[in-house]
């Protein structure tokens, strides 16, 4: 069983390796960590860590598919202000579309619905990272968009 300091060292080393954007397989990550002195590491542990930290495979500058930790899709934490979870707000003639960090849409939609008609919100529908919000009678989508922008202190 690893001591907490060794676990923290493993996490730091793991994140540092992924920032290099040169590992195309989990096996390569295992080998690199073993070479760094983490001998009790295997592919299944790497797989769990990749999932836990939200790692994705993407193309690097050399157009190779590699694992990385995308900063814009960071996992929300207890200390994340809600405004940091809202990525984009747009509208058309009938609906306001709000894009959030993955997993944050239902939280943001619940907040919007709690404000209700007084703020111009008739209702909201949320998926994983997208919210559709429709204006209450007497409000335009542009007014609703502006109210939501002000609520989240955004300048999009």
UniProtKB/Swiss-Prot annotation:
Compartment annotation: Cytoplasm
InterPro entries found in the cross-reference section: Arg_repress, Arg_repress_C, Arg_repress_C_sf, Arg_repress_DNA-bd, WH-like_DNA-bd_sf, WH_DNA-bd_sf
A Pfam short name: Arg_repressor
Recorded superkingdom: Bacteria
Organism phylogeny: Bacteria, Pseudomonadati, Pseudomonadota, Gammaproteobacteria, Enterobacterales
Organism of origin: Proteus mirabilis (strain HI4320)
Protein family (similarity comment): Belongs to the ArgR family.
Job description of the protein: Regulates arginine biosynthesis genes.
Cross-referenced NCBIfam families: argR_whole, PRK05066.1
Protein name, UniProt field: Arginine repressor
One Gene Ontology term of the molecular function aspect: arginine binding
Keywords for this protein: Amino-acid biosynthesis, Arginine biosynthesis, Cytoplasm, DNA-binding, Repressor, Transcription, Transcription regulation
Main localization of the protein described in the UniProt heading: cytoplasm
